[in-house]
Amino acid sequence: MDLIEDVKAALRASRRGATVLNLGVFDTFPELAGRLFAQISGNVAVGSTVQSVYAADATLVEITTYDIAETARRNFEPGGAAATLLFARGAHAVMAHRVAHKIWADGDTTLALAIKTSCARVLSNDIHPAAKIGAGFWLDHGLGFVAGETSVIEEDVSIWHNVTLGSTLNTGGAVAIRTLAQAL
């Protein structure tokens, strides 16, 4: 079974849960991601943007599904990748960032910041759209996580919460930590 079929099976197993999530009908990852983010953000335009960005970039879908698989593998919660996609706040934050980063890289910085801000309000983290994050990133709950514009997180990195990258909170002296490597 693939991720979409696993999510459908989980929703069929709990009609009340499916009603609360209110995701409707979906057949592809971009459709599911769009519906999920419309619910998370409370904004249909955010969901539509998420769906269109994923629909236009198969590599982004591949990286995101790898993030989800790695989160499910490293996390201690039951339910596998389907539950991770539906319920993991950290995975949602990484997905929102990946969409905002793609939009930023394509030159629409206002839309990228709007997506970032809309999602950050409900996910309790702040990841600048210019921050570079490698595949396989596991952000546990993501609460209090901040990554500044110059942050670089390499592949297969795990972070729990209350971490700030890219600031020293002063005007001189210490150098900000901006890059996290796999071994950390």
Q: How should each PLM-predicted stretch be described?
A:
Residues 1-118:
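Terminal amphipathic alpha-helical/low-complexity segments used for targeting or macromolecular assembly
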Residues 101-184:
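Flexible, glycine/small-residue-enriched loop-and-beta-strand segment within the central core
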